[in-house]
């Protein structure tokens, strides 16, 4: 084992909890303009008309090409791959040998022997590691996110989201386009360039008819495609969205995208840790919040905890299959939305600014996540029953809320819980001195906007 690996770094620092709690980094970065108009109107646009986000910078894109592409993906993904191929897409789920979630990413079927994984670096790196070390006849093609890539990206990505998304694309195209099924990929021309588009949604209910299209193509075509979309969108009141609004989209859709990945411990992931560099994403990631446990494994989740049961298919062999089969009929935690009490939120906002010696942890508006992995304790009757993850405000919900994972008995509409806001002790310069406080919250098992 060399010294320049994640595994070596963990040994030097004294384990994953110490490393993550001391890391100075904040929330996952979106290197784009903060606002184009203002984040409130930008949030409202994805419900009332449409919004266009430029996703060309913040996500890692790793491609796989060759005769073993399908075999590689099937060996690592919990999803079924029986019908996967060209112009198909999936929310790819990867687990360790104990059935604990490593992460998810969007899998694009570009050709029958070519696919790409797009998202935060964890899952693309996990699959690339196996492609390079597992004896697969696969070429790995990396297009790093902008923070790790001083050059130009290979592709542009534009997310067009909202009820007028299809009308805007058709106006830009100059006529009707063929219907693209949910989580399928279609193509058409814009500004004389071939554009491919995935039908999925970042807000609202997944499966809505073409209310969300992720358009992508060669980077050199991006400016012309963007111009024609902006021109077409004027008639419909479309807005461009900035990083502030973008950070809140998952709150409405319910995508809990950044739990601690189950890669920091265990023999089944040791090779991966020894393959990763000591200065990469998982080495620099940070952990914050009031949820405090003795072992990093207490922060891990399973696909069942996040509602991904329908993405776990036992029609093929994959890493974690045996564990997930054994776990499937047990009681699991559940993902829920927590609507924070308006009075308590108002008190928090004031306390973070005017609290003096009793200052509370600053509640950044509209998105108050201050680490890569945000874990705040959820209590019921004084006992810890789960953790709150992403938290923030959207005008569409009309209040402050968070995504959470709680014990099943508390995952019922109207259940009352409290969220502990603030950390038990400052460990990072980026977190100000403050006192912890409790916020009342109400459980909802369905989206709040």
PLM regions: where:
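Conserved, structured C-terminal
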Residues: 1-25, 34, 111-449
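Charge-dense polyanion-binding interfaces
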Residues: 84-95, 99, 185-193
């Amino acid at each position: 084992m060399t010294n320049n690996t994640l595994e070596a770094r963990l040994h030097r620092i004294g384990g994953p909890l110490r490393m993550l709690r001391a890391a100075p980094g904040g929330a996952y970065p979106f290197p784009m303009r903060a606002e184009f108009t203002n984040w409130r109107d930008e949030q409202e646009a994805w419900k009332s008309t449409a919004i266009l986000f430029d996703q060309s910078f913040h996500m890692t894109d790793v491609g796989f090409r060759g005769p073993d592409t399908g075999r590689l993906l099937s060996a690592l993904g919990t999803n079924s791959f029986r019908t996967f191929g060209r112009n198909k897409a999936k929310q790819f789920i990867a687990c360790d040998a104990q059935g604990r979630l490593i992460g998810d990413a969007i899998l694009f079927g570009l050709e029958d022997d070519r696919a790409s994984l797009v998202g935060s670096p964890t899952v693309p790196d996990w699959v690339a590691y196996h492609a390079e070390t597992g004896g697969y006849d696969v070429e790995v093609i990396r297009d790093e996110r902008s923070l790790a890539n001083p050059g130009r990206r290979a592709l542009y990505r534009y997310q067009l989201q909202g009820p007028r998304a299809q009308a805007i694309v058709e106006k830009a195209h100059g006529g009707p386009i063929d219907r693209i099924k949910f989580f399928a990929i279609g193509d058409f021309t814009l500004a004389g360039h071939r554009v491919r588009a995935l039908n999925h949604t970042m807000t609202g209910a997944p499966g809505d008819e073409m209310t969300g299209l992720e358009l992508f193509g060669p980077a050199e075509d991006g400016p012309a495609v963007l111009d024609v979309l902006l021109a077409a969108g004027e008639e419909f009141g479309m807005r461009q969205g900035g990083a502030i609004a973008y950070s809140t989209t998952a709150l409405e859709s319910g995508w809990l995208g950044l739990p601690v990945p189950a890669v920091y411990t265990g023999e089944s992931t040791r090779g991966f840790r020894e393959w990763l560099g000591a200065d990469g994403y998982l080495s620099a990631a940070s952990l914050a919040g009031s949820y405090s446990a003795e072992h990093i494994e207490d922060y891990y989740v399973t696909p069942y905890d996040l509602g991904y049961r329908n993405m776990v298919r036992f029609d093929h062999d994959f890493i974690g299959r045996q564990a997930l089969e054994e776990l499937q009929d047990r009681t699991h935690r559940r993902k829920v939305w927590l609507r924070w009490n308006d009075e308590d939120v108002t008190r928090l906002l004031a306390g973070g600014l005017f609290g003096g010696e009793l200052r509370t942890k600053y509640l950044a508006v509209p998105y108050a996540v201050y680490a890569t992995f945000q874990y705040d304790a959820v209590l019921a009757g004084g006992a810890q029953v789960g953790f709150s993850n992403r938290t923030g405000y959207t005008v569409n919900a009309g209040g402050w809320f968070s995504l959470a994972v709680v014990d099943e008995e508390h995952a019922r509409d109207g259940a009352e819980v409290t969220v502990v806001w603030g950390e038990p002790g400052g460990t990072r310069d980026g977190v100000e001195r403050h006192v912890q406080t409790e916020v009342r919250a109400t459980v909802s098992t369905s989206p709040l906007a």
